[in-house]
Amino acid sequence: MIKTIKYSKDVDLERELARSQFSYDDVNETVESILKDVKARGDKALIEYTEKFDGVKLENLEVTEEEIQKAFDTIDKDLMEVIQYSHDNIKKFHEKQVRNDFLIRQENGVVLGQVVNPIEKVGLYVPGGTAAYPSTVLMNAVPAKIAGCDEIIMVTPPTADGTILSSILVAAKISGVDRIFKVGGAQSIAALSYGTETIPKVYKIGGPGNIYVAMAKKMVYGEVSIDMIAGPSEVLIIADESADSVHTAADLLSQAEHDKLAACILVTTSQRLADEVAIEVEKQLKELPREEIARTSIETQGRIIVVENMDEAVFVSNFVAPEHLELAVDNPFELLPRIKNAGSIFMGHNTPEPLGDYLAGPNHTLPTSGTAKFSSPLSVDDFIKKSSFIYYSKQGLEEVKDKVIKFAENEGLTAHARSVSKRFEK
């Protein structure tokens, strides 16, 4: 049964809402060994690990054009239509995030500005094997393509027969992925970080994965950039008397089925709703194929918090800083300005979180574990870098030379001062 708490200032939210985290201790040594091995032996190591972990011995790591064409020929046409629809929505949303160069001209001949450039080579990890997550392909590849990355490399584990599922290949092609490789796990992160005979080294790696992939991303950070280290999934629902208990329970369980560590929290001003949702969660749990996973999540990470008013509800939500926040209230737009910490916000009674997972348009790669207090969803910004530039005319430099020299001398950097003063010696 999901635990219900009556909120007061005496409630220790830190303790009551402590979220479980993946434990990396058991995989550190294994991941470090894999990274070193791939760095040293390249493709040979990748082929061996693919046989060991995925049960298939590959002759070629790269997906061919023939395989991609076969995917288009064999994919369920309704699914292809859904993938295209999702792609178009994601593209439309992320195009609004594009940043432009800017220029500032001053009368004394000084020109200042910023130029925006895409990260030239990016690598995307997509979970694979028997699991198909074309939405992950779209959410990572589309913003990279819009950013203008020269080369988008995708890695994903093969199935037991050495192929990649059609939905993954179709989503990749539609999104503009340039090359796809049949390799997963920590070994694929190593390949993207160091490069092999076949797989090029990239400058940034994005995409979710299991604990081995997450640990590998942590270890290679600095050699390359990474998007984020995602923790278990989470949802917090703020609900008032107008919320439907059946829908609210279903929304909690849509996250609970992800992972035994997923956090599912309802914050409500209605004791009636709290009681009904607790009963409804138990009822719906029995109807789920992934009941065991969802039940563990609900019983260990699930909470219903009853508050006196919306001020308390907002306080709890901002404290938690959830990955997904649902505002199951009559006037969500009135509440929105008060929400300071959330990855993605789902407004009103007809906006269940899975809309954001698949096709609404905003990115579903979101900060977890409270990091929404200082982090943002994946966006075009993650695939660009900005350079500032400075141009001073002789007149412009002369006007500020004494100030620069004064600053440099104050900091004890004589050579800094001389690099300016030397330009005015006769």
Language model regions located:
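Short internal beta-strands
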Residues: 150-160, 264-270, 348
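N-terminal Rossmann-like NAD(P)+-binding subdomain of aldehyde/semialdehyde dehydrogenases
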Residues: 1-120
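Conserved small-residue-rich beta-alpha loop and adjacent elements
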Residues: 104-170
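Short acidic-hydrophobic, aromatic-tinged amphipathic segments that line or gate anion-handling sites
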Residues: 2-8, 179-184, 304-309
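A conserved active-site cap/scaffold subdomain adjacent to cofactor or substrate pockets
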Residues: 228-300, 304
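Conserved NAD(P)+-binding/catalytic subdomain of aldehyde/semialdehyde dehydrogenases
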Residues: 176-254, 258-263
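C-terminal core of ALDH-fold dehydrogenases
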Residues: 318-426
